Regions:
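Extended, loop-rich substrate-binding clefts of extracytoplasmic carbohydrate-active enzymes
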Residues: 2-29, 34-38, 85-139
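Acidic, contiguous internal or C-terminal segments within carbohydrate-active enzymes
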Residues: 24, 44-62, 118-167
Length: 194
C-alpha cells in the first residue's frame, strides 16, 4: 500500500526503514537527550533523538532566538517514514527531507564538536554533520562529512532546512555565481534569481 505513495517527488518505498502509521493525540511529558554548546555570545541545543537537528540557537547578548523553534515537540504525520517536527535546523541528505528526521541518529562529542549522523540504507552512504561554536565567535559552524561506501558514483543533495520567524529582519542571500536552485527534488531545478 505504501510503495505507491508519491512523496514530494520521491518514491514512497522506504524499506528497510521503519514506518510509523499513526501518532497519539495524548499530550505527555517526555525528556530528550540533548547537547548544549555555548559561549558568551550564543547557546545552541542539539537533539540527536529527533533526526540530529539543531533545535534552537539563542543570542545571549539580547535574548533573541536566532532560529524558530517550537517550545514543545509535536510531530505531524508528513514525513516519508511518518512523523516530522517543524522548527530548528534539519540536515537533509541524500534526497530532499531525510526519511529519518524523527528517528534517533548516532551522536558523540569530541573536541568541543558534536557529531550527528547515520548510514543511509537506500544509497549505502554515511552522512555526518559536526556542530561547533568557537569561544570568540557568535555563530554556529557545521562541518559536513559524506562517505560513499560503495565503488559506484552516487548523486545526492545536502541541504539544511532552517526555520526562521518571518519578519522584515531576514533575507536570503546567495553568492553572485549562483544561477540555479533546487526544490525538494534534485530533478526540480529553478533558475535564480526568480
Amino acid at each position: 500500500f505504501f510503495e505507491r505513495r508519491n512523496y514530494q517527488g520521491a518514491s514512497g518505498k522506504i524499506y528497510p526503514l521503519p514506518f510509523t502509521a499513526s501518532i497519539s493525540d495524548e499530550k505527555k511529558d517526555k525528556k530528550y537527550d540533548a547537547y548544549v554548546l555555548e559561549n558568551k555570545y550564543i547557546k545552541a541545543t542539539l537533539l540527536p533523538e529527533i533526526g540530529g537537528k539543531i533545535h534552537s540557537i539563542l543570542d545571549k547578548t539580547n535574548n533573541y532566538d536566532i532560529i524558530y523553534h517550537n517550545k514543545v515537540i509535536k510531530p505531524a504525520m508528513v514525513g516519508l517514514c511518518g512523523p516530522w517536527v517543524s522548527g530548528g535546523i534539519e540536515f537533509n541528505w541524500p534526497q530532499h527531507h531525510r526519511p529519518t528526521t524523527f528517528i534517533p541518529v548516532e551522536s558523540k562529542e569530541k573536541n568541543e564538536t558534536v557529531y550527528m549522523g547515520e548510514f543511509d540504507n537506500f544509497f549505502s552512504m554515511h552522512g555526518t554533520v559536526g556542530i561547533s561554536i568557537k569561544e570568540d565567535r557568535n555563530y554556529v559552524k557545521a562541518h559536513i562529512i559524506v562517505y560513499n561506501s560503495t565503488p559506484f558514483r552516487r548523486r545526492f543533495m545536502w541541504w539544511a532546512n532552517t526555520a526562521v520567524e518571518i519578519n522584515d529582519n531576514y533575507a536570503v542571500d546567495f553568492p553572485p555565481d549562483v544561477s540555479s536552485v533546487n526544490d525538494h527534488d534534485r530533478r526540480c531545478v529553478l533558475s535564480w534569481p526568480i
